[in-house]
From Swiss-Prot:
InterPro entries: M3A_MIP, MetalloPept_cat_dom_sf, Neurolysin/TOP_dom2, Pept_M3A_M3B, Pept_M3A_M3B_dom. Belongs to the peptidase M3 family. This is Mitochondrial intermediate peptidase, mitochondrial. Residues 214-227 have a biased composition (Low complexity). PROSITE patterns: ZINC_PROTEASE. Residues 1-29 form a transit peptide. The gene is OCT1. GO terms for molecular function: aminopeptidase activity; metal ion binding; metalloendopeptidase activity.
Length: 706
């Protein structure tokens, strides 16, 4: 049925379930997690699920009476809203809550709601009602008609039109795919791998706080991780090879053997995901066959701008061909730099060298000291920067508001309201930005509640959580961000704003619920602001002196920004091609995935493949972006065009913000994605390619000097 990355709304008494279960009360009004009254305790997830199923059942009964078409669509949207409030709250809790009981109950809730979704997705009464509504001219708005059409298509992509036996198989496959995706993610979290390095002096001192000490006998005895070390024991470090730690080691460690060991281990675990990925590929392919498609990629790409995997592959191959000469030049430059630094004119350049030497080249050529840069980006000042940006562009202000007892999941969580002087509150944003054990390891924007029109006088405001993992340096009580972290913060803020500024009638199209290959455009667009001195000078101040960041330093940062743009572009094209290969048409005989990945790397990058490494077994984008990773490259092209043609001349003006909001943000997914883009930036932003649409690459390639 509907995609349940989406949400819904009611007919009569539409606020009854919501008011009973959600509050935005002040600090004195006790509530539950995220403002949901049910979630005062972990066990409350059970009641949360039960009430959502009960409310959805009432709405299904109402729809079965075939009311007017507008009421059918409203009720369908409420079912989605009701279910998604539980699903999304459970996902956020699962990823961020420090209490294990809450995490376990959230897991159970997610599984139970997923099972219930299968029941809804195979409900022929709902399907018949949606078909009736779609054909009815009484749907008075384009958004209502578009919602009806999308709901019908979502039903059919779920197999509602199949005979009962096939539909049962589709449901079983869908459940299996859900479980495999969860297993893949859990394996990554549970088995990051590790490498023990002796002596500890081989690791730079400023990284020691990221690592656990370990000891061994100087005579070569057994190793242990206790601190009961005598003088006969040698201290080393156990490096957990999770992506964040691996990145730090590869950037800062001069010892090539250490980098090599960490690179290989970090790109070889978790071993269990080899089998999980094989099963996932097979299950998704079988699902596509049941649905009458050639591949899972066909299913996933068809609703998007690209329309066809052939269009995607053609776009990627053309991009690969365009950037290869420049990428080869960059590779030679890095290799020559390594040879000079290590005094070996025949030294070969290996993948574990890339981050170390490119960072060194950027710093030396552009006089950029990352520690100096970070001193101008204490986290509280970066939050001020987001506030300055929103006020400049949209005339809206963020205000810190008190959290009600029971609403928060950690003492570090902050809640903001986005307020407009003429429109009132636009939505709510939780900030959970500090690193802690057991928390989601990356940065992401999580929806908690989507926006939707409840009546002519009432609008359900969106609620979003922005989650990051910023940590203090070992010698500081202040969290200071390196510039890449500032860029990530602005990226995720772009996603959050997409939801907060959306004003759709139906939550089905609220905010980021757009075509997959358009969804990353706002986040990529807002990355540009992290580089623009016109904004940076208004918030980036030295953590101890208060000095504004020097323009010369920002110019140096910008000089380093695109030094290896072709290499990075190659990497993204390579990832996207792997994604298409894994979930594209499958041969009759089993494939050696590792061999195919190695071959694609040789064809589309300038770097060696390291035998025995399998980085893709921890590439979680294969789960939620399966056959859709190309969307990041689409988004980069769209964002570059929009930045240069609309924002760059006057990036902080209310006129620029009004154009972005009125032409793009407020519509969410309620308008055709191609129409959204051309209304904002003109027809040159896209071009028709075969049966689909591809982005214009001119602006991006010029920006990157490719």
């Amino acid at each position: 049925m509907w995609k349940l990355t989406r949400r819904l709304q009611p007919h009569i008494n539409s606020t009854r379930w919501l008011v009973r279960n959600f509050r935005n009360g002040g600090a004195g009004d006790a509530t539950g997690l995220y403002g949901f009254d049910h979630l005062k305790t972990a066990k409350g997830f059970q009641r949360f699920v039960a009430d959502a199923i009960e409310r959805s059942g009432e709405l299904v009964s109402y729809i079965s009476g075939m009311p007017s078409s507008p009421e059918i669509i409203k009720a369908m949207d409420e079912i989605s809203d009701t279910v998604c409030c539980v699903v999304d709250s459970a996902e956020l809790c699962r990823q961020t809550h420090p209490d294990r009981e809450f995490v376990e109950e959230a897991n159970k809730a997610a599984i139970e709601m997923n099972d219930y979704l299968h029941h809804l997705n195979t409900n022929h009464t709902l399907y018949a009602a949606v078909k009736k509504a779609e054909q009815d001219s009484n749907l008075l708005t384009k958004e209502a008609s578009r919602t009806a059409h999308h709901l019908r298509m979502d039903f059919e992509r779920g197999g509602i039109h199949l005979d009962p036996e096939k539909l049962d198989k589709v449901n079983n496959l869908t459940t299996n795919i859900f479980q495999l995706c969860r297993e893949f993610s859990e394996n990554i979290a549970d088995d990051p791998g590790h490498v023990d390095i002796f002596p500890g002096s081989r690791i730079p001192r400023h990284l020691h706080h990221l690592l656990n000490p370990t000891y061994r006998s100087t005579s070569g005895g057994s190793r242990g991780s206790t601190r009961s070390a005598h003088k006969s024991k040698q201290k080393g470090f156990r490096i957990n090879t999770d992506p964040r730690t691996v990145s730090s080691i590869l950037q800062w460690t001069s010892d090539e053997e250490v980098r090599k060991m960490v690179y290989i281990q970090g790109n070889s675990v978790p071993h269990a995901n080899h089998g999980v990925l094989e099963k996932l590929i097979a299950a998704r392919h079988e699902l596509s066959q049941m649905m009458g498609c050639n591949s899972y990629a066909d299913i996933m790409v068809e609703p998007n701008l690209a329309k066809s995997p052939k269009v995607v592959t053609s776009f990627l191959q053309e991009l690969s061909k365009t950037v290869k000469p420049k990428a080869d030049e960059e590779f030679i430059a890095i290799r020559d730099f390594k040879r000079e630094k290590c005094g070996n004119p025949s030294a070969e350049l290996e993948p574990w060298d890339e981050t170390y030497y490119t960072s060194m080249m950027k710093s030396s050529i552009n006089d950029v000291d990352t520690a100096v840069v970070a001193s101008y980006f204490p986290l509280p000042q970066c939050i001020e920067g987001l506030k300055v940006l929103v006020e400049s562009l949209f005339g809206a202000t963020f205000h810190t508001i008190p959290l009600a007892p029971g609403e928060s999941w950690h003492p570090n969580v902050v809640k903001l309201s986005l307020h407009h002087p003429d429109e009132g509150d636009l939505g709510y944003l939780y900030l959970d930005l500090y690193s802690r054990k057991g928390k989601y390891p990356g940065c992401a924007s999580f929806a908690i509640r989507g926006g939707r029109k409840i009546s002519e006088t009432e609008y359900q405001l969106p609620v979003i959580a922005l989650v990051c993992n910023f940590s203090r340096a070992c010698d500081s009580s202040i969290v200071k961000l390196n510039h890449s972290e500032v860029e990530v913060l602005f990226h995720e803020f772009g996603h959050a704003l997409h939801s907060l500024l959306s004003r759709t009638d139906y939550q089905h199209f609220s905010g980021t619920r757009v075509a997959l290959d358009l969804a990353e455009m706002p986040s990529n667009l807002f990355e540009y602001y992290a580089w623009d001195y016109r904004l940076l000078k208004r918030f980036a101040r030295h953590y101890s002196t208060g000095e504004t960041i020097p323009e010369k330093l920002v110019n140096s940062l910008q000089g380093a920004r695109n030094m290896f743009a072709a290499t990075e572009m190659q990497r993204q094209v390579f990832y996207a091609l792997i994604d298409q290969m894994l979930f594209g048409e499958q041969p009759e005989t089993a494939r050696d995935v590792s061999h195919l990945v190695a071959e694609l790397k040789r064809q589309h990058t300038s770097w060696n493949h390291v035998e025995g490494t399998h980085w893709y077994i921890r590439f979680s984008h294969l789960l939620n972006y399966g056959a859709g990773y190309y969307s990041y490259l689409y988004a980069k092209c769209f964002a570059s065009t929009i930045w240069q043609s609309i924002c760059e001349e006057d990036p902080l003006s209310l006129n620029t913000g009004t154009l972005l909001r009125e032409k793009f943000f407020k519509h969410g997914g309620a308008k055709d994605p191609a129409e959204l883009l051309t209304d904002l930036a003109g027809k040159e932003i896209i071009s028709v390619h075969g049966e689909g649409i591809v982005p214009a690459t001119t602006y991006l390639l010029n920006e990157l000097r490719l």
